[in-house]
Amino acid sequence: MDMNSFSPMMPTSPLSMINQIKFEDEPDLKDLFITVDEPESHVTTIETFITYRIITKTSRGEFDSSEFEVRRRYQDFLWLKGKLEEAHPTLIIPPLPEKFIVKGMVERFNDDFIETRRKALHKFLNRIADHPTLTFNEDFKIFLTAQAWELSSHKKQGPGLLSRMGQTVRAVASSMRGVKNRPEEFMEMNNFIELFSQKINLIDKISQRIYKEEREYFDEMKEYGPIHILWSASEEDLVDTLKDVAGCIDRCCKATEKRMSGLSEALLPVVREYVLYSEMLMGVMKRRDQIQAELDSKVEALTYKKTDTDLLPEEIGKLEDKVECANNALKADWERWKQNMQNDIKLAFTDMAEENIHYYEQCLATWESFLTSQTNLHLEETSEDKP
């Protein structure tokens, strides 16, 4: 596999092709539908925050009803993400949108920000719902169904502060030791992630710059229509021509605004999501390495008899099983994630290319129509001047 590219045209294995064919031939078995909508602002003496309505419709037997409606704030989504990472350390958990911290609580929650976050949270939950393992997570079910007080009570049942601190200390110690013999396939995976992170971050910067320049171009172009209208008032012989130019500029402005909307709603969010995915993947690799490092330390202790060796063989056996499960989970999820990534990025850029083609065709047709009308007008005037 070529690690220097994440092109969607990379060949797939025969087995994955067979699985894909089977999937396409089977009927849609989706049984969990989630919608995030109706953001609502809450202002207290301590904080200002937004809650979102989450409607869940399902035919699964483990749910007590077929439809649920709850409200959740961003912190609740963070809790869910943390619980999923805790339960499935080497699965690729979908990323949440960043929690922007801006001076002034009210200014932070403008309409564009709220709508962008709503879409990202909607995608986050639906990616979990579509995941073959995460979709059956008990905390995910509780997140979708429990009322606010029930969710708050459930959160308190988690590990205490000292337990979490102990886990953090062990994780840091494992990362400091490092992994001596990381399997080759995970070396390749890590190289892919590093290269992917570089490329997707570069694409993100370029996309943001293109949007910024497009916005500046649009703001300047908007001024030219009124200028030509004012100009026409002082040019009696060019009134119609100048007004037609103003009309062409106005139509091109509307086309530009539509293209900018497509860029901000279709391409930029996809690229940004995969920037966050690249950070998530690095975290997944670290967690996998921590599990292996823990096994390596036990094996080393047994080899050099650094501690009581009576219980070590049993501990090593359990850790070997844990490493194998972690590796298998990551390998399976990796292929699934990579296929989704290739499809998402390909679709985003294809849609953007089609949008650009339509935009330039529309602007070209606008000005060609104007030139044709002016040519016809000139011919009519010429024929009238002839004796």
UniProtKB/Swiss-Prot annotation:
InterPro entries: AH/BAR_dom_sf (IPR027267), BAR_SNX7 (IPR042131), PX_dom (IPR001683), PX_dom_sf (IPR036871), PX_SNX7 (IPR042130)
Gene Ontology cellular-component annotations: early endosome; early endosome membrane; phagophore assembly site
Annotated ranges, domain BAR: 178-387
Annotated ranges, domain PX: 30-151
Places the protein is found: Early endosome membrane
Topology relative to the membrane: Peripheral membrane protein
Disulfide bond positions: none
Xref: CDD domains: BAR_SNX7 (cd07666), PX_SNX7 (cd07284)
Keyword entries, A-Z: Endosome, Lipid-binding, Membrane, Protein transport, Transport
List of residues binding a 1,2-diacyl-sn-glycero-3-phospho-(1D-myo-inositol-3-phosphate): 73, 75, 103, 117
UniProt entry tagged with the keyword Transmembrane: no
Transport found in the keyword field: yes
SUPFAM superfamilies xref list: PX domain
Chief location of this protein within or outside the cell: membrane
GO molecular function: phosphatidylinositol binding
Known partners and oligomeric status: Heterodimer; heterodimerizes with SNX4.
Family: Belongs to the sorting nexin family.
Function: Involved in the regulation of endocytosis and in several stages of intracellular trafficking. Together with SNX4, involved in autophagosome assembly by regulating trafficking and recycling of phospholipid scramblase ATG9A.
Listed name of the protein: Sorting nexin-7
Gene name of the record: SNX7
